Amino acid sequence: MNDNKKFWQRYAPIYSLFMKSVDKSYDEICTRIVPYLKKDMKVLELACGTGMFTFCLADKVKSWEATDYAENMLKEAKTAYEKNGKVINGLSFSAQDATNLPYADESFDAVMIANALHIMPEPEKALSEIRRVLKTGGLLYAPTFVHGEGAAFVFRSGLIEFFGFKAYIKPTNEEFAQFIGQHGFDVMEYEKIGGKIAPLCCMIARKSE
């Protein structure tokens, strides 16, 4: 088990509390993604975590498969779904490795992967797999933390690393857009959202021809 999987397995029960600091940013990203969703779409979500994006978007499409590499994260997501009491037709959960997906080529209309590419040792492999399972012209939603500014950002990053979390790439907003564009996608949106401490790149891209 790699170090980051150990981290997520260990801290899954308190992840949602930790992420409360970016709730407003997540809400804004959901608002920006909704216009790109259609009722007949089949969507795959990678690295769903505790379901913070899952539960605000999954009811907008035909089917939504929420997956994560860390089984404890999936457990928390399922528990949150059951406690919520709202039935989302077409929502399913499964444990999957984003770099080695079991699905057939061109299986999905869109793929969501939030705050995960920067913590993968080989994000290129994940993007290759995402391209493979996306239909021609399929969409990628990849909101991702990018490099912030100031002492508060440095302190937050250092604190997270102290507890065992590792970011393999630390791109600026523009660098992340270039990275996505270099791996088989046409970038449609990449606006930076949030403050200096925990900014997010609202990445929306389309599978290149």
Each model region followed by its residue ranges:
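A short acidic, Gly/Pro-enriched loop at the edge of an enzyme's catalytic core
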Residues: 99-110
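A short SAM/SAH-binding and catalytic strip from SAM-dependent methyltransferases
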Residues: 110-122
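C-terminal alpha-helical "lid/dimerization" subdomain adjacent to the S-adenosyl-L-methionine
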Residues: 2, 18-22, 141-199
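Class I SAM-dependent methyltransferase SAM/SAH-binding core
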Residues: 44-100
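Class I S-adenosylmethionine-dependent transferase superfamily signal
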Residues: 33, 57, 130
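Short glycine-centered segments of the SAM/dcSAM-binding site in methyltransferase folds
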Residues: 42, 138-139
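A short glycine-rich, Lys/Arg-flanked "PGG" loop and its adjoining helix->strand segment in the class I
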Residues: 124-136
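Conserved class I S-adenosyl-L-methionine
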Residues: 1-39, 52, 76, 83-85, ...
